[in-house]
């Protein structure tokens, strides 16, 4: 019974307790394979555009809310994709150092508070899109670890939005 209560609490919260150090290490390793490995036909912008495509499909957020309107041939949109993917890279790679990660997430939260129209729900959808694309690129991805750790990141960035 105690294990069930603990499991349900963890699943409901998807918080720091759920993105354990082991989860974080798995996510960092798998992100490295997706983000940094030289995979044939894949690049940072291709992965980033796939993340945004998944985000637009699941969130209901209009591509027009972003520079370049979601056009994968538009340099303004590709610059936005690069900023988001780079931010995700830094956040993911800081997961094993919670003080650094929390400071970064607080900084990203402040940046997003200054942008009209950004919501916590949209941040959550984007984090889920990242997990979804990782699972597509890396079929052996540990999706539970991704869900826990991306929920932690989304909660930090999206707090109060």
Swiss-Prot record:
Domain Globin: 18-161
Annotated GO CC locations: extracellular region; hemoglobin complex
Protein name, UniProt field: Extracellular giant hemoglobin major globin subunit B1
Known function: The extracellular giant hemoglobin is able to bind and transport oxygen and sulfide simultaneously and reversibly at two different sites.
Molecular-function annotations in GO: heme binding; iron ion binding; oxygen binding; oxygen carrier activity
Compartments it resides in: Secreted
Signal peptide: 1-16
Top-rank taxon: Eukaryota
């Amino acid at each position: 019974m105690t294990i069930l209560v603990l499991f349900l609490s963890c699943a409901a919260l998807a918080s720091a307790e759920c993105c354990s150090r082991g989860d974080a290490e798995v996510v960092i390793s798998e992100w490295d394979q997706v983000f940094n490995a030289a995979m044939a036909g894949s690049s940072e912008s291709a992965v980033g555009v796939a993340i945004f495509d998944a985000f637009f499909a699941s969130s209901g957020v209009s591509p027009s809310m972003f520079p370049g309107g979601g056009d994968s041939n538009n340099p303004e949109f590709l610059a936005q994709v690069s900023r988001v993917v780079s931010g995700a890279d830094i956040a993911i790679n800081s997961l094993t150092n919670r003080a650094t990660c929390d400071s970064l997430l607080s900084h990203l939260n402040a940046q997003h508070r200054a942008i009209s129209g950004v919501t916590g729900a949209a941040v959550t959808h984007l984090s889920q899109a990242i997990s979804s694309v990782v699972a597509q690129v890396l079929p052996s991805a540990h999706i539970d670890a991704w869900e826990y750790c991306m929920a932690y990141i989304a909660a930090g960035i999206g707090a109060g939005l």
